[in-house]
Amino acid sequence: MGQVFLLMPVLLVSCFLGQGAAMENQRLFNIAVNRVQHLHLLAQKMFNDFEGTLLPDERRQLNKIFLLDFCNSDSIVSPIDKQETQKSSVLKLLHISFRLIESWEYPSQTLTISNSLMVRNSNQISEKLSDLKVGINLLIKGSQDGVLSLDDNDSQHLPPYGNYYQNLGGDGNVRRNYELLACFKKDMHKVETYLTVAKCRKYLEANCTL
């Protein structure tokens, strides 16, 4: 009987520690989702502002080219539709989100558009991407109970954006900026979707449908 009473405080402490870790993990999820939502909105605004500087014919032509082209980050394997996203594990969605954010750390520094607001935004974006990458890595560690973490050996190395755009013609700067902004907007929407679904699945929220 005495041993039972001695074990009770230990069990209570373990229970409280477990609850504390779960609450901290949920807090990190909320922060990550809020940050990527902000990045997505910022990417949408930058893209819309840039489109507003183009002539209608130029905008239509660039949109046609972009629909036939692909983004540098498309080499990262990710769900192809809503159904596949819903079926993916929380850990898989976190890993893909990490890769997508990581793929934009360097390109985000090259959004040098001749607009002071956009240049300030590009600097702000680089910082937010780095913070979000750290946050997602913490979520991955929490989901794996700290057994594994993402390191350099586990990274998918993407081709540099400089090579990706080196064959563009005389209007390369305009097309390059258009595609960078369009791809950034697309990828931030992906990460927002994946983190939202992962959070919903992790904490069994009422409606996880897309």
UniProtKB/Swiss-Prot annotation:
Pfam family of the protein (one) = Hormone_1
Q: Which PROSITE patterns match?
A: SOMATOTROPIN_1 (PS00266), SOMATOTROPIN_2 (PS00338)
Quote a single Gene Ontology cellular component term.
Answer: cytosol
Q: Which Gene3D superfamilies match?
A: 1.20.1250.10
Tell me which Gene Ontology terms the entry assigns under biological process.
animal organ development; calcium ion homeostasis; chloride ion homeostasis; growth hormone receptor signaling pathway; hyperosmotic salinity response; magnesium ion homeostasis; negative regulation of testosterone secretion; positive regulation of gene expression
Q: Where does this chain mainly localize?
A: secreted
Instruction: Read off the InterPro entries from this record.
Output: 4_helix_cytokine-like_core, Somatotropin, Somatotropin/Prolactin, Somatotropin_CS
Positions with a binding annotation for Zn(2+): 38, 192
Is the keyword Cell inner membrane in the record? Answer: no
How far does the signal peptide extend, from start to end residue? 1-22
Q: Where in the cell is it found?
A: Secreted
By its UniProt entry, which CDD domains does this protein fall under?
Answer: somatotropin_like (cd10285)
Q: Which UniProt keywords apply?
A: Disulfide bond, Hormone, Metal-binding, Secreted, Signal, Zinc
Whether Secreted counts among this entry's keywords is yes
SUPFAM superfamilies this protein is in? 4-helical cytokines (SSF47266)
Tell me the disulfide pairings in this chain.
Answer: 71-183, 200-208
A molecular function (GO) term: growth hormone receptor binding
Top-level taxon of the source organism:
Eukaryota
Its family remark reads: Belongs to the somatotropin/prolactin family.
Provide the function of this protein: Growth hormone plays an important role in growth control and is involved in the regulation of several anabolic processes. Implicated as an osmoregulatory substance important for seawater adaptation.
Q: This protein is called what? A: Somatotropin-2
Q: Which organism is it from?
A: Oncorhynchus mykiss (Rainbow trout)
What is the name of the gene encoding this protein? gh2
